[in-house]
Design a protein with these regions (language model features):
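Accessory carbohydrate-binding/adhesion or oligomerization-edge regions at the termini
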Residues: 1-19, 97-105, 178
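Active-site mouth of glycoside hydrolases
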Residues: 79-87, 107-111, 241-384
Length: 384
């Protein structure tokens, strides 16, 4: 992955407030709108037979179409969130061909007018993965504190896709390699898609930026014969976030946030960031006693959140919504335009659904420099 402007194609553009093209939403230039074409062949492993196969783009700027063996697999916008396509129907035995058409500008660019260098291309990882047809569709973990912030209040909700009657869902919580909680539930019917589990963990070690104590959630699914179908892990910490008397409290303690805004930017690769550079950023922040980071002004690579969990940094997670250039437009903002309500909501809701299980996130941000309008009230109400 990388920004094509730093790979020998086209030129990067820096703008502060103004759009890099005349503002006329939702229209974008037709005389200058570079397009990147990517083609790659791949072979699907034989042992993936019978499974659903997904194609994942972690971040493409600013919009793209993709085809598998000449069949349109999908279209996506929002340069900073992943796009997942179920490509199972388009695959064949042997070699397969993937083609991607990336547009530098799209109508989504009106919501991506951040004050920074403007780049384009496939800027985050792209990968294939296979999952069983009977699988965990989604999960929500809330791990708070109770009884004077001493005990852990564990609440887990799992949604299943095509559950197999007679199969089981197993939940484990581990601490430093030791299982401290385990529960199994049998799937009773094909409509038994919801799994909820609550548990009180006495005298847990809470998570905060100074002592980022992490536990590990392990979720596994099995078929009716006891064969393992799938297993995944989610590191998490027990912590509470609340507002009291105008102060934000973490685990009942008022915290002074000493933070920075951090862009994803590399002088050689543009918007493509390595895990090694993320760790260097965190080490530098810790060296100067910083404890908070705002993902200005868009969702970051998912690895960044895992590192903030591990090293201990409070996160303000920000939606990829900035329409700074609209302040010079007669409308002033897109936040009151009915045509833009769905794009606003998609960018906020997709971010929250991706990141809601991240312990380090203590604040959700609805965007940056986009004026005020009713769409932000809608986003606020949905997020709450």
């Amino acid at each position: 992955p990388g920004s094509w402007e730093l790979q020998g194609f086209d030129s990067p553009i820096y703008t502060d407030v103004a759009y890099p093209f005349p503002a006329n939403p939702p229209h974008v230039p037709t005389d200058y709108n570079p397009v990147g074409a990517y083609v790659r062949e791949f072979t699907v492993p034989a042992h993936w037979k019978g499974m659903d196969i997904f194609l994942d783009f972690e971040g493409v700027e600013s919009a793209f179409y993709c085809w598998v063996n000449g069949e349109l697999a999908g279209y996506s916008e929002d340069s900073r969130l992943p796009a997942h396509f179920n490509i199972t129907p388009f695959l064949k035995t042997g070699k397969n061909k993937l083609a991607v058409k990336v547009f530098r500008y799209s109508d989504g660019s009106y919501l991506e007018d951040q004050d920074y260098w403007k780049y384009s291309g496939i800027e985050r990882d792209v990968y294939l993965y296979a999952r069983p047809q009977s699988r965990v569709q989604d999960f929500k973990l809330v791990a708070g504190l109770t009884n004077g912030y001493k005990d852990g209040d564990f609440n887990l909700n799992i949604t299943l896709h095509k559950p197999h009657p007679g199969g089981t869902v197993e939940v484990k919580v581990m601490n430093k390699g030791n299982v401290i909680y385990q529960h199994k539930k049998e799937i009773t019917s094909a409509t038994d898609t919801l799994f909820a589990q609550k548990h009180l963990f006495p005298a847990i070690l809470p998570w905060n930026a100074e002592t980022p104590n992490l536990y590990t959630l392990v979720v596994s699914t099995y078929d009716a014969q006891g064969k393992a179908l799938e297993s995944f892990t989610q590191p998490f910490g027990f912590r509470s976030v609340e507002m009291r008397n105008g102060m934000q409290l973490i685990n009942g303690v008022a915290v002074l946030f000493k933070g920075v805004n951090r862009h994803e930017h590399d002088p050689h690769h543009g918007r493509t960031i390595t895990v090694e550079s993320m760790i260097k950023d965190i080490q530098l922040m810790k060296q100067f006693n910083l404890n908070a980071v705002r993902t200005c002004h868009y969702p970051n690579r998912y690895e960044w959140y895992a590192l903030c969990n591990e090293y201990g940094l409070y996160l303000v997670d920000e939606a990829n919504i900035e329409s700074h250039g609209m302040q010079a437009h007669k409308d002033g903002t897109l936040a009151n335009n009915p045509d833009w309500e769905v794009p606003f909501m998609q960018r906020m809701s997709r971010m929250v659904l991706r990141d809601r299980n991240i312990t380090a996130i203590v604040t959700w941000s609805m965007g940056n420099e986009s004026g005020y309008g009713k769409h932000f009230e809608t986003l606020y109400d949905w997020t709450k």
